[in-house]
Regions:
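Active-site-adjacent segment of FAD-dependent monooxygenases/related oxidoreductases
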Residues: 41-44, 48-116, 120-122
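N-terminal Rossmann-fold NAD(P) dinucleotide-binding loop
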Residues: 16-17
Length: 508
């Protein structure tokens, strides 16, 4: 492995792997180290939210992830009085939306997500250095020097940038002197385990409410096991043995016909709710659980970390290739407020779960992360009124029924791959952009752009169903610059090409 990578990534969970993929597909030299001797077992965070599925679509792994999971898994909850409530359906407000390709969460084990990310990384020429630990590091104005230990052998690596995606106990965060603000609530504990189950069907996520707390069994797609979750009261035995798990299950369900097998993996979760006061110190960054940890209620943690990496990756690559380093200041400015909002949401969900002795079976739009955006960021520029539904900084919506030279496509099919995309309604503008950095798409026909032409050229779009004009609230002059991470950088309804040119010039 090179001793002078541009980026050293510490921690090869979902966040670190996503960042490595972002760099690899842009040909940025990196090293990805992981202290564990091999891939981590355990389902852990098992819920993939729709916005994260869009990230995986962009990275080229969504089909693999979907193949090993289940969308909108039914939920069956037995109440304190024995009443059974069914839920888990796709939110009504999100059904048949051409701007949203994935409308509800996917259940899949976290190790399957890591597996798909490692496979894609290998296809891009990258790999994980397992059994390699960060000992310490120092930084200067020009670089970071890190001491690594691999099997007792130490070496110094010099990198331009260091990213700590090494979890809640992050060595990178601690050695950077970054405060991890928040609290540990020892009274809120939960046993989590992966195990085989007899006497229970796999057609739903089963939950039971009880005065002493909830217990649940969720079938894990693409495996033969369930994820067991059982809350533990203060002072209650938190033994991870099969006998204790079986005892808790029988006491809270009143059923002795459900038989658990020896856990393949288990852990005791405690409520740690914390947020780093900074995401960056000089040439060192934090991402994922190293920067924020919270309750699993609402299924936000892994998703937020993956989206941290999706935000940081293209910016690091741009700076490595000559963009101003000030671009990297926008990482904390954009992502830390998102994490703060996630903590607020997950805390509210946790309080509801504790109060009601179990979590809700109703899915809604609050957790799917499609409303996450960066309005007000220095990377968000538009000439629209503040009351406009779509503004710069928002997630770029999808659209269906687009006729191109290659047949019918979704918009996300055309924007995939991690480049800027300039979407114009009407005649394509002349901005002199490098086509290796920006993709040019022009809506040349449809409700907002006139009659269908007899010939469709490369890059031209016929908006046959009017979905793209509607999603972007476009006129025949509108220009939309979509960032590499799928958020809107510029909207100009007046068709001002200077706004786009100035924006792109700042990235050079």
């Amino acid at each position: 492995m090179p001793n002078t990578p541009e980026v050293l990534i510490v921690g090869a969970g979902p966040t670190g792997l996503t960042l490595a993929n972002e760099l690899a597909r842009r040909n940025v030299p990196f090293r990805l180290i992981e202290s564990a001797p091999g891939p981590q077992p355990g389902s852990r965070g098992k819920g993939i939210q729709p916005r994260t599925l869009e990230v995986f679509d962009d990275l080229g792994i969504v089909d693999r992830v979907l193949a090993n999971g289940r969308i909108a898994m039914p939920m069956r909850s037995t109440g304190l009085d024995g009443t059974v409530t069914l839920g888990g359906a796709e939110p009504e407000s999100l059904r048949n939306r051409p701007d949203i390709p994935y409308t509800t969460s996917l259940i899949t084990p976290e190790w399957r997500v890591e597996e798909a990310l490692r496979q894609r990384l290998a296809e891009l020429g990258g790999s994980v250095e397992f059994g390699t630990t960060l000992v310490d590091f120092t930084q200067s104005d020009e670089s970071v020097a890190a001491t690594l230990d691999s099997g007792g052998s130490r070496a110094t690596v010099t990198a331009s940038w260091l990213v700590g995606s090494d979890g809640g106990h992050s060595v990178v965060r601690k050695q950077s002197g970054i405060t991890f603000e928040g609290e540990t609530r020892d009274e809120l504990r939960m046993i989590v385990a992966d195990l085989a189950v007899d006497g229970l069907d796999r057609d739903a996520w089963h939950m039971w409410r009880h005065a002493e707390g909830a217990v649940s069994l969720c079938p894990l797609p693409s495996t033969d096991v369930f994820q067991y979750q059982g809350s533990i009261l203060p002072g209650q035995d938190a033994d991870l043995s099969l006998a204790n798990l079986q005892s808790i299950l029988e006491q809270r369900t009143g059923r002795t016909d459900i038989r658990l097998h020896e856990p393949e993996w288990s852990t005791l979760w405690r409520a740690n709710i914390r947020l780093a006061d900074r995401y960056r110190v000089g040439r060192v960054f934090l991402a994922g659980d190293a920067a924020h940890i919270h309750s699993p209620a609402g299924g936000q943690g892994m998703n937020t970390g993956i989206q941290d990496a999706h935000n940081l990756g293209w910016k690091l690559a741009a700076v490595v290739n000559g963009a101003s380093p000030t671009l990297l200041d926008t990482y904390e400015a954009e992502r830390r407020p998102v994490a703060a909002g996630v903590l607020e949401l997950s805390n509210a969900r946790l309080a509801d779960t504790v109060a009601n002795k179990g979590m809700s079976t109703q899915r809604d739009a609050s957790t799917i992360q499609l409303n996450v955006g960066y309005r007000g960021s220095s990377l968000a520029r538009d000439d629209r009124d503040e009351t406009a539904m779509l503004r710069a900084g928002d997630r770029a919506p999808d659209a269906t029924g687009l006729v191109t030279a290659d047949g019918e496509r979704r918009l996300f099919d055309l924007t995939r791959g991690g480049r800027f995309t300039l979407l114009s309604f009407g005649k394509a503008p002349m901005i002199g952009a490098d086509e290796s950095r920006i993709r040019m798409l022009s809506v040349v026909a449809g409700p907002a752009a006139g009659p269908v032409p007899s010939r469709i050229d490369a890059g031209d779009i016929v908006d046959s169903e009017g979905t793209i004009a509607s999603a972007y609230d476009a006129t025949d002059n509108t220009l939309v610059l979509i960032r590499p991470d799928g958020y809107i950088g510029v909207i100009s309804d007046s068709g001002e090409t200077a706004a786009v040119s100035d924006y792109l010039d700042a990235m050079r």
